[in-house]
Amino acid sequence: MFFSFACPVCASYDQTFSRWAKTLPPGWSAEFLPVAVPDKGNYIAARAFFAVQDADPSRLAAFMSAAYTLIQQNGMTMEDPGTWSRAVAMADVQGFNEAWHNVTQQRLERAFAKLLTYGVDATPSMVISGKYVITPDDVSGDSALYMNLANGMISKVMQER
């Protein structure tokens, strides 16, 4: 699942994606990947996301919700280090500072490479089984239909196996 904290559509799907990920069939999982394009804001956002993922993965969903709130509702920017320190505090993430320093450039580059590999050109985008890329644009922004499409694509892949 490719997302950007600067994307209002991603913010609107935040809780939906979190709930949906818990309903996936056995053997399936949702991987959230920040859009790690080489600009300062996205670079910092991706680094913060990976730091939380490493430091305190059980707090990742809370961190994402806090980041969306700060950026989408409170007008903070992805370039501002204060955005991430506040999101970490709001989500009660432990071990963030050490993890921040351990996020490598290679990890950010791998996330960017995946973005290019799958041809992701909009957020949010779901890549299903490495074969299908779907966005809310595919269903004219209908969130219920988008989630049904995602479930249908997973069923299709399961039948093909």
Say what each PLM segment does.
Residues 80, 84-88, 94:
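Acidic, glycine-rich loop-and-strand cores that form catalytic or ligand-binding grooves
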Residues 3-6, 122:
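Short pre-active-site segment immediately N-terminal to redox-active cysteine/selenocysteine motifs
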Residues 5, 11-82, 152, 156-157:
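Structural alpha/beta surface segment adjacent to cysteine/selenocysteine redox centers
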Residues 1, 29-33, 125-127:
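Soluble periplasmic/extracytoplasmic beta-strand elements of cell-envelope proteins
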Residues 18, 85, 112:
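Short glycine-/small-residue-rich flexible loop motifs, especially phosphate/cofactor-binding loops
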Residues 21-24, 87-91:
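Alpha-helix C-terminal capping segments
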Residues 52, 85-88, 115:
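Hydrophobic alpha-helix position signal
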Residues 90-161:
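C-terminal cap of thioredoxin/glutaredoxin-like
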